[in-house]
Amino acid sequence: MAPRFSWSLATSWHALAILALWPASTLAGDKSAADYYVRELPGLPKNSPPIKMHAGHIEVTPETNGNLFFWHFQNNHIANRQRTVIWLNGGPGCSSEDGALMEVGPYRVTKDNALTLNNGTWNEFANLLFVDNPVGTGFSYVDTNSYIHGLNAMATQFITFLEKFFALFPEYQSDDLYIAGESYAGQHIPYIARAILDRNKSKSRAETWNLGGLLIGNGWISPQDQSSAYLKFSLERGLIEKGSDNAQQLQQMQRICDKEMSINPGHVDYPECESILNKILELTRVGSGDQECINMYDVRLRDSAPSCGMNWPPDLKYVGPYLRQPQVISALNLDKQRNTGWQECNSMVNANFRNQNATASISLLPDILKEVPILLFSGAEDLICNHVGTEELISNLAWNEGKGFEVTPGNWAPRRQWTFEGEVAGFWQEARNLTYVLFHNASHMVPFDYPRRSRDMLDRFMKVDISSIGGEPSDSRIDGEKGPDTSVGGAKNNTQQHEEETKQKLKEAQWLAYQRSGEVVLVIVIIAASVWGYFVWRQRRKGTAYSALQSDEAAGQSRTGLAAFHNRQSDRDLEAAAFDETTVDNIPLQESIGRGESKYSIGDDSDEEEGETNKT
C-alpha cells in the first residue's frame, strides 16, 4: 500500500501544480503591457534622459487581421494633473511616425540612423500616443481586400483600439485625454471625438474617458471652404499674378468647383476642386525643362516636379531608413512576419478611404464644441490646407449661440498678438470654446518649424501650470500679458524624481533593517557572555568547596595552588586553569558587533543617478 500512497501523493502535487499554472498558460496567448515595453531604442544619444516607451500592434478586427500600431511615450513631468495626447497624421493613409520623429515626439532622426533630442517635445507635460490610423497605414496592417472606406468605420475601430489600450495600460484611463493632429486628421479627429462622447453616455462615470480637448493643425475640416481658398491664397501671395491669363483660367476652374459643391454640399472630396491645386502647381513650374514647382506645404520653398513638396521635410530622407532597420523593427515589437517595410503614405489606404459621399467633419464641430474645447492652428506658409480656408471655415461656422468669432452683434473677438521669447510668433483669437492660432513663417507642419512654440501653444490650451514643480518658464506673452508659466526650463523630471525618491526610501529601509540586525547581534553576544560568565562562576564555586574539604596540610599549600590557578601551565586543576578570571571583562563585544556590521552593504555612493531631462 505504501508505494501506491506515495504515487498518489506525487500525482496530487503534480495536479495541483498544473492547476496553479493553468490560468497563466491560458492567458499566454494574450499580450500584457510588458510585451509592449521598448527596452532599447537604436540610435539614442549617450546619456540621453530615460523615457519609458511602449509600442506594438493591437488587434481591432480579428476577422480581417486588422491591427493598429501605436508608439507611446511617458510624460517627462506631471503638472497639475495627468494628461495624454493622441497624435494622428493625415493622408488619409499617412503614418503618425511622421509626427513622432519629425514633429512633436521626443526624438528627431539625423543621418547615420542617429537620434537627437527634440527640445520642444509634446511629452513634456503629457503622455504621447502615436497611432498609425486607419488600418493599413504605416506599421498598421489589414488583409489586402479589407481596407476601410469611411469615417464612421474608422472611428469605430479606433474606439476598439482605445478600449484595448486602456485595458493593457489602466493607469492612463483616467488621464485628461486630448486628440491632436494635422491635415486629413481634421476629418479623423472630430469623428473619433464624437464616438468617444457617444460612448461616454452609455458608460458609468468610472468607465468614461475624460476628453479634454481637440487640436487640429492646418486641417482638412471643411472641404468647401478649403477648396475655395486655393485660388484666393495663391493670388494674395503672388503665386499667381492677378488679372493674368493663368488667373482667368483658374477662375473658370473655380466656378466649376463651386457648382459641384453646391450640388453635393457637405462631402469630403471634390475631384473638380482638387484639379485647381494641381493646376496651380503646374503653373508655378520653372527652371530647365520646367522641372521645379513650389512646395505646396511651404510656398517659400521649391521642389522637383511632380512631387511639389512630397519630398519635404528634409528629415524625411532619414526617417524611412531608420524605421526599416531590423533593430528598430525588433525594438518596437513589430510582427516580423506581417512587416513589409514602413511606408510614409499608403496609396491603397488613400484610394479606398476617399469616399466622396461621406459627410465632412465640419458638420460635427457645433455639437462637439458644446462639450469640448477645440483649438485650430495654421502655419501661414501652407498652400494645401491654408490659413485662408481655416479662417473662412470659422467665419461661416455657427456654434454655441453665435456665428464665427462674433461675440456681440458687429463685434468680433480680437486677434491678440503672440510673442515668444521676444519675437512675434503669430496671433490668438478665441470665443465660445473655439481657439484659433496663426503661426507666422510656418509651414503645413508647424511643430517641425517651431517645436517649442507649438509646445507652448499646447501647454496653454491644456492649462498647464509649472508653478508646482519649479523650473524656468519661457517668455511667452499674448498682448504683452505673460499668463501662467507653461514651459519648463530647469525642473527635475517628476517621473525620474519619483523613482529616485523610491530608491532613497529603499536605502533607508535597508539601513533600518541592518541597524536592527546589529541590535539583535548585540543582544545575542550579551546573552552569550552572561551564560559564559555564569558557567565560570559555578566552576569557581565548585573549586572553593573542593578546597574546603582538604586536610590542613593541603590547605597550607593553598597559596601554591592559587598561584598555580593563575599559571596556565599548571596541571593541578586543568578545568579551572583553562579560564583566567581576569579575562572576563575583556570579551570583545564591540569587536564582534563591528565585524557583524561590516558584513552588510547598505548602499553604494557610486550608484549612477538617472540623468535629468533637458528642459526648455
Curated annotation (Swiss-Prot):
Its EC number is 3.4.16.6. The active site is at S183, D382, H444. Residues 1-28 form the signal peptide. GO terms for cellular component: membrane; trans-Golgi network. It catalyses: Preferential release of a C-terminal arginine or lysine residue. Belongs to the peptidase S10 family. This is Pheromone-processing carboxypeptidase KEX1. It comes from Metarhizium robertsii (strain ARSEF 23 / ATCC MYA-3075) (Metarhizium anisopliae (strain ARSEF 23)). The gene is KEX1.
